[in-house]
């Protein structure tokens, strides 16, 4: 076996790819949760409204069940009232492993050649391929001992850069792979953490999907932290609706939470990344993150679309051992990086 490849810790390499600088300094983001019975929320009091019963969004096109689609649900072709579709991809063009970057260069920026979030893995374009109508991020450790990671940034009209509001949907699932995690996130175009970070979904591969909204005034802290009932091991469509007044979060077209806290005001772009957690993954750990399709909508000219709301207003159900009315000091939540 050859020597292990040392991941680059050059922050500029990450910035050049639209990645958070945290990728260049080894900050873990997909740390596995502490396992406790029940679900937990960790939020500032009143910051997050949880849907008492998940309710279909009123602005989005209902999912269309399609048994011929790789995930069983086809990519929506309509963008809903008040929104305009500016990006959509269903990965119909197949590639060899490692051939994705060249084949999709007009549609995606691909992470390559720098350290992943935990600082132990390395982003490589070679982990990416498109086959059978899905994007496959194949995570594994090289013979030299380097864990490989994958990351993509959609390019709207072939151009790099984000939005100041939008609706972002990705349909994905993953294998359960020890030592690896995934995050779909909104990240600052200027790579300034204080501009905001919104992670949904986020979590260890094959584990529960988490929602994390980092506090604008102190981004190392999370103003919203919530474990959903969805498993990353199953096909689900995850949607972030971001408006100036509110952010809402949907799974399979149903609202699971909404917040008015720490809403970004700067330009943000969508990232989907999968890499190692804290420490080195087991050498034999290997598996895939699969993405069936992804879409980006922006407000139509002259329109001010509203983020979707759950029914029942601010009434939140019991979540694990406490409710949204429980004082923050009484909360006990598992931590996800």
Question: Could you tell me what each predicted segment is?
Answer:
Residues 7, 59-62:
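N-terminal compositionally biased, intrinsically disordered segments and leader/signal-like regions
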Residues 1-38:
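Terminal targeting segments of Actinobacterial cell-envelope proteins
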Residues 49-59:
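Hydrophobic alpha-helical membrane-insertion segments, chiefly the h-region
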Residues 16-17, 58-59, 66:
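Generic N-terminal simple sequence motifs
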Residues 28-30, 38-40, 50, 62-337:
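GH16 jelly-roll
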Residues 44-47:
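Sec-dependent N-terminal signal peptides
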């Amino acid at each position: 076996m050859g020597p292990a490849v040392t991941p680059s810790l050059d922050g500029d390499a990450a910035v050049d790819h639209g990645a958070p600088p945290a990728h260049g300094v080894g900050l873990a983001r997909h740390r596995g949760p502490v396992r406790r019975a029940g679900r937990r929320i960790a939020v500032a009091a009143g910051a997050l409204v949880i849907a008492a019963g998940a309710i279909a969004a009123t602005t989005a096109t209902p999912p269309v069940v399609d048994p011929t689609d790789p995930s069983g649900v086809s990519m929506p072709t309509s963008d809903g009232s008040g929104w305009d579709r500016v990006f959509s991809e269903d990965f119909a063009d197949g590639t060899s492993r490692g051939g994705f970057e060249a084949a999709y260069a007009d549609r995606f920026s691909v992470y390559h050649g720098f350290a992943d979030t935990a600082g132990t893995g390395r982003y490589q374009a070679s982990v990416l391929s498109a086959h059978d109508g899905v994007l496959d991020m194949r995570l594994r450790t090289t013979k030299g001992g380097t864990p490989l990671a994958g990351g993509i940034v959609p390019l709207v009209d072939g151009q790099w850069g984000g939005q100041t509001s939008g609706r972002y949907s990705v349909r994905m699932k993953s294998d359960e792979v020890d030592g690896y995690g995934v995050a779909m996130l909104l990240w600052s175009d200027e790579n300034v953490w204080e501009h905001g970070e919104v992670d949904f979904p986020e979590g260890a591969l094959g584990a529960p999907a988490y929602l994390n909204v980092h506090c604008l005034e102190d981004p190392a802290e999370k103003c919203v932290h919530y474990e959903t009932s969805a498993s990353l091991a199953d096909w689900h469509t995850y949607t972030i609706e971001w408006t100036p007044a509110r952010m809402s979060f949907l799974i399979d077209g149903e609202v699971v939470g909404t917040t008015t806290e720490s809403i970004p005001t700067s330009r943000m772009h969508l990232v989907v990344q999968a890499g190692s957690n804290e420490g080195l993954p087991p050498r034999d750990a290997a598996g895939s993150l699969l993405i069936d399709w992804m879409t980006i909508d922006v407000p139509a000219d002259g329109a001010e679309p509203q983020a979707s709301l759950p029914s029942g207003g601010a009434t939140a159900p019991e979540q694990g051992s406490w409710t949204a009315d429980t004082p923050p000091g009484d909360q006990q939540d598992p931590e996800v990086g």
